[in-house]
Each structure stands twice: as structure tokens, then as C-alpha cells.
A protein has these predicted regions:
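Short, low-complexity disordered leader/linker segments with a strong preference
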Residues: 1-45, 70-71, 119-126
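Extracytoplasmic "Venus flytrap"
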Residues: 45-72, 77-91, 95, 99-101, ...
Length: 325
């Protein structure tokens, strides 16, 4: 496991931009999934509080969790789909506590607002492992570990790519008008990707970020906001969309506005997640670059739990390697 997860983000080698395709497994997700209770008392009971099923990436993420925590692997899984509501996740965690599960796995919708319920889990002696997104708490002993992507680094890499792209186009001195479709407000993916890109953008004297708007990580909202931005601004050069689902909607809006996107298009498109459909659009030239965020995280959390079961010391944070297309 240790060879797959980086313990220190600063030790990562320079990112190589290569074509990759994510294999997205999945089927329609119910709001709650629970393994049939087994008579075997030796099964490890894991309660999972998932964000929702708002995107193709999230569906693949859920599938990776369900694949890892099977009865065949020694687990009983209690799964809760919060439908993008933090209150639902808090309710689910309290339900897991009352059921006396062995471990709680949380992919938090927002960073803040977790101190009380995580303290309740700690008082009950139930370790909490964070997956994908992070929390902001006063006491970091309220969770055992976290595994996911470095969202700040993802945002930075998007900015560095754009800087290099403009130089290769001979346009490094041109004014560049940028709009940003942000994800769910308060989510660590949104916060990190925004911060990382802005760090690069602020030192570019000719980059103008016209607006940064909330696209909620959904295709419908991405299209709605992009259409509004196109009505408001006639000279958009670049759209930075913080996930592929919003990008799909933005591309629809761009086409309906009579403009073109991607390689040799009117608008340069930077996307995140690199789901299969996003990769295909890169190959077709409609998306210029897609920054990968690996959804296959369930197996890493399962390994953390196995290490804890074996009494091994675990790290506080595990970063997945970055690969872009």
C-alpha cells in the first residue's frame, strides 16, 4: 500500500502529462446500501457517509468503496448517500455511532461544522477515517487519518499548464480573460483548486479573472452559469471548470452561444477529474487539459483499517499521486 500512496506531498516527482483513461465502474446508486448482516461476528462493521451521487466521478468513488468493503474481504458495509446535505451526513454518523460500528468513513461535503459529531464518535471509541475531502476542526485527533488528492496542487498545475500553453502559443503578453466554474461551496476540493489556481494567476500581470461562480459540481449548474457568463462577457478566453460534469454543461452552453471550445477553439477549456467522457473530449480536442483526481480510493482506506486492526502505526494523511491528460 505504501508504494501507492505518498506520505509527503513535497516528495512527489514532477508531474508528467500523459494520456490516461479512468475505468469508471458503477450502476445506479440507491440512497442507502447495506450488506446483508452476517452471522459471523468477526466481520468488521464499517459505516460510510458519502457526499452523494452528483457526478460521474462520485459514482466511481462510491463503487471503489463498495468494492473494497465486501463480506468476502471481511466487512459488513453500512452505506449512506447524503445527497449533498451536511445535515444528512451528521445524522448518518450518529446512526453509525448508535449501531456501534467499528469504523466510520466520511467524505465530508464541507470542511467546517464537524467538531461536535466527530467528538461524539471519538467518545464512543469509533475511529473516523476521512476520504477524498478534508475537515477543518480545532482538534485533529477527532479523526484517525485522511486519504485523497492534493487539491491545491491540482489547481496550481492547471495554472502552470495555462502559463506554458500561452507561451507555446506566442501569447504570453496577451490579455487573458478567465472565468472559473467552482464546485460545491465549502468543499475542500473547491477551496483547494481555487486557491491553487489563484496562486498562479495572481503573479500573471495579464491574466484577468472576470468571475468565479459556484457550479455545484453538476452539469446543469455548469451549463446555467456558463450561459450567463457568455451573455455577460463577449471576450472569454479561458474557462476553468473544477470538475468534468460542470465542463460538460459549459461545453453545451458554449456551443449554443455559437462559439467553439478546446484546441483551436474560441475558448480554452481546463477541466478536472479526468473521467472517461472527459478523457474522450480531450482526445477529440474539445477540452484542452483534464487534471486527474483518482476516484479509486476505497482500497486505500481498507488498507488503513487493516493496518489499524494489526496495531500498526498509520499516517495522518495519505496523498494520491497526480496524473494529468
Amino acid at each position: 500500500m505504501r508504494q501507492f500512496i505518498r506520505k509527503n506531498i513535497w516528495a512527489v516527482a514532477p508531474v508528467v502529462f500523459v494520456l490516461v483513461a479512468l475505468v469508471l465502474l458503477g450502476s445506479p446508486l440507491s440512497s442507502k446500501v447495506q450488506e446483508t448482516p452476517a452471522e459471523d461476528d468477526n466481520l468488521i462493521v464499517v459505516g460510510v457517509a458519502q457526499v452523494g451521487s452528483e457526478s460521474v466521478w462520485r459514482s466511481a468513488h462510491t463503487q471503489s468503496i463498495q468494492d473494497a468493503f465486501t463480506r468476502a474481504n471481511g466487512y459488513m458495509l453500512i452505506f449512506d448517500n447524503a445527497r449533498q446535505k451536511q445535515a444528512n451526513q451528521i445524522k448518518a454518523i450518529r446512526s453509525f455511532i448508535s449501531q456501534q460500528v467499528d469504523y466510520i468513513v466520511l467524505s465530508p461535503i464541507e470542511e467546517s461544522g464537524w467538531d461536535t459529531v466527530l467528538q461524539e464518535a471519538k467518545d464512543a471509541g469509533i475511529p473516523v477515517i476521512l476520504i477524498d475531502r478534508k475537515v477543518s476542526v480545532d482538534d485533529d485527533s477527532l479523526y484517525a487519518s485522511w486519504v485523497g488528492s492534493d487539491f491545491v496542487r491540482e489547481g496550481q498545475d492547471a495554472g502552470y499548464w495555462l502559463e506554458d500553453y500561452m507561451k507555446k502559443q506566442g501569447r504570453e503578453d496577451d490579455e487573458v480573460n478567465i472565468v472559473v466554474l467552482k464546485g460545491t461551496k465549502g468543499a475542500s476540493a473547491t477551496i483547494g483548486r481555487t486557491r491553487g489556481f489563484n496562486e498562479v494567476a495572481k503573479v500573471q500581470r495579464n491574466w484577468n479573472i472576470l468571475q468565479q461562480v459556484d457550479g455545484e459540481f453538476t452539469t446543469a449548474k455548469g451549463k446555467e452559469e456558463m450561459a450567463r457568463l457568455l451573455d455577460q462577457y463577449e471576450d472569454i478566453d479561458v474557462v476553468v471548470s473544477q470538475n468534468d460534469d460542470m465542463t460538460f454543461g459549459a461545453l453545451e452552453a458554449i456551443r449554443e452561444a455559437g462559439k467553439t471550445a478546446g484546441v483551436n477553439g474560441d475558448i480554452t477549456v481546463i477541466s478536472f477529474d479526468a473521467v472517461d467522457a472527459g478523457v474522450e473530449l480531450v482526445r477529440n480536442g474539445e477540452i484542452n487539459i483534464d487534471v486527474q483526481c483518482n476516484p479509486d480510493q476505497g482500497k486505500y482506506v481498507e488498507q488503513i483499517i487493516q493496518d489499524m486492526e494489526d496495531g500498526k502505526e498509520i499516517e495522518k494523511a495519505y496523498y494520491l499521486s497526480l496524473i494529468h491528460i
